[in-house]
Each structure stands twice: as structure tokens, then as C-alpha cells.
Amino acid sequence: MQTIILGGGCFWCTESVFLSVKGVESVISGYMGGNAVSANYEAVCGGDTGHIEVIKVKFNESTVPLEVILDVFFATHDPTTMDRQANDVGSQYRSVVFYTDETQKPTVDRTINKLRDMGINIVTEVHPAVEFYQAEDTHQDFFNRNPGQAYCNFAIPPKLAKLRKEFSQYMVS
């Protein structure tokens, strides 16, 4: 098993995407990368801690390689706009990859360089993982538990449609 931490806007949205990927064993929403000694939703959304909304993705690389995890990540959020994903604005929504093992960094760098070679201006930050603060229970598996939530119904279906179209062989049936 491998673990990688990804920040691509609201963690409700990124969580929903990766819960739909074969070989992903778990997805935990949380916070990382800040300067405060703890993190919670209210403080992070207030911009007071420097933390980023992230998901911790634990996956079986024999089923879904890290390259595919990263390709899905970059395809299902906007890695070209600083501190913003759709209507979510603020540094807590920035695009970031936190690698948990030094062997992951070359793959992350290759993936970003491949996109840049295609003329895409990637602003995604890349850092070694630091302390992860698990989000409150109300934020875990949010969309599945709140299917009527308006923001999720606006933001998540297009991401899942893109996943289905571009990565169907890796999508949970």
C-alpha cells in the first residue's frame, strides 16, 4: 500500500473522485501544510492556520499505479489557478501534492513536467508530507452521506463524468 496526500480544492469534491477509483483502499479528508499547531474546519476556512484542505489517499499500486492517481488528480481539478477551485477561493483550496515517500517525488515531478511540456501552466505545489490533521467526522464521505447538498451536486458530477470518460478502466463499477 502507498499513501499520498492531495489538495485540489474542497475536500468533499476530491474525496468523491478518489472513492470512485479502483485500488483506492481509503480516502480521509483533512488538513495539512499550515503553521498552527492544530486545524479544524472553521479555522482553516477562515484562513487563519495556513492549512490546506486535503485528502489522504491510501491505494494499492498493483491495481492503480501512482501515475494514474496523479493523472486522475490533475484531470479532475484546476491545477492552473492559484488559490482557487471554481467558487472556492483562498489559500486553503490551493493545488498541492504532499508525497509520503521520497520515491514518489520523481513520479510527481514527471507528471507535472509532462503537463508543462503540453503548454499547461501548472501552479501545483509539491512538498514532503507533514503532520496530517483528520477533518471532523461530518466531512468524511460527505457527498455519499449528503446527496442533496447543492454545492456537491454542482461540483462533483462533472468530475465523476470526466473520471468515467478518461479513466473508465480504473473506475469502481
Swiss-Prot record:
Record-annotated active site:
C10
Amino-acid biosynthesis listed as a keyword: no
Query: What keywords is this UniProt entry annotated with?
Result: Oxidoreductase
Q: What is its EC number?
A: 1.8.4.11
What InterPro entries does the annotation carry? Met_Sox_Rdtase_MsrA_dom, Met_Sox_Rdtase_MsrA_sf
Query: Is Hydrolase found in the keyword set?
Result: no
Single GO BP term: protein modification process
Reactions that this protein is recorded to catalyse: L-methionyl-[protein] + [thioredoxin]-disulfide + H2O = L-methionyl-(S)-S-oxide-[protein] + [thioredoxin]-dithiol; [thioredoxin]-disulfide + L-methionine + H2O = L-methionine (S)-S-oxide + [thioredoxin]-dithiol
Q: Which family does it belong to?
A: Belongs to the MsrA Met sulfoxide reductase family.
Biological role = Has an important function as a repair enzyme for proteins that have been inactivated by oxidation. Catalyzes the reversible oxidation-reduction of methionine sulfoxide in proteins to methionine.
- Full protein name: Peptide methionine sulfoxide reductase MsrA
Q: What species is this protein from?
A: Psychrobacter arcticus (strain DSM 17307 / VKM B-2377 / 273-4)
Question: Taxonomic lineage per UniProt?
Answer: Bacteria, Pseudomonadati, Pseudomonadota, Gammaproteobacteria, Moraxellales
The protein's gene is named: msrA
